[in-house]
């Protein structure tokens, strides 16, 4: 099996999970990557050694989980909706932390009002942290990426 096929299989696995099953799955993935994750009501957080917090949400706008995935060239689709918002962000974070031990935040119920993000924002985790930058990996509409505040000179120097 090619390396790329393995990665697509990992993404497919993430796309098929319900939010709470995914939360348990991600907790195990973080532990396997050397983190000590904290599973709280509304979010899953793991402190890293790199001063960046990577954020994605575990819910999707779609009611049903992906059951069948269709491939048309490099495009994935599903009758249930692919769940790319924000399962692709989760997948991207899992790839990034293989090389950089960033802090990680996976939130619940973003699509119904940022419930998990609000709970994290008032938690002790955000107060007792050495985070210089927060990068939320999410999407909006049909574009590949959305960028906000990319003209920060300090961030540009950091990267």
Per-range role (PLM):
Residues 38-40, 54-56, 75-78, 104-106, ...:
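General beta-strand structural signal in soluble alpha/beta enzymes
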Residues 13-50:
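A non-catalytic alpha/beta surface segment that caps or lines the substrate-entry region
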Residues 1-17:
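N-terminal hydrophobic or amphipathic helices/low-complexity stretches enriched
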Residues 46-84:
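Catalytic-core environment of secreted peptidases
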Residues 7, 18-29, 116, 127, ...:
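General structural feature for long, well-ordered alpha-helical segments within catalytic domains
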Residues 61, 82, 86-159:
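Acidic/histidine-rich catalytic neighborhood of metal-dependent amide-processing enzymes
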Residues 2-6, 67-71, 93, 133-139:
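Short amphipathic alpha-helical segments, especially helix-boundary/capping motifs
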């Amino acid at each position: 099996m090619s390396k790329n096929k393995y990665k697509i299989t990992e993404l497919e696995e993430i796309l098929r999970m319900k939010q709470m099953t995914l939360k348990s799955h991600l907790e195990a993935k973080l532990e396997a990557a050397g983190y000590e994750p904290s599973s709280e009501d509304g979010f899953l957080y793991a402190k890293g050694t790199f001063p960046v917090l990577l954020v994605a949400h575990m819910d999707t706008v779609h009611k049903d989980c992906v059951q069948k995935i269709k491939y048309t060239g490099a495009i994935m689709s599903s009758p249930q909706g692919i769940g790319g918002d924000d399962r692709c962000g989760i997948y991207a974070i899992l790839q990034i932390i293989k090389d950089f031990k960033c802090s990680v935040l996976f939130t619940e119920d973003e699509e119904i009002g940022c419930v998990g993000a609000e709970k994290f924002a008032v938690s002790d985790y955000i107060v007792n942290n050495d985070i210089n930058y927060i990068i939320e990996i999410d999407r909006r509409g049909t574009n590949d990426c959305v960028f906000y505040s990319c003209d920060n000179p300090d961030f540009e120097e950091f990267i």
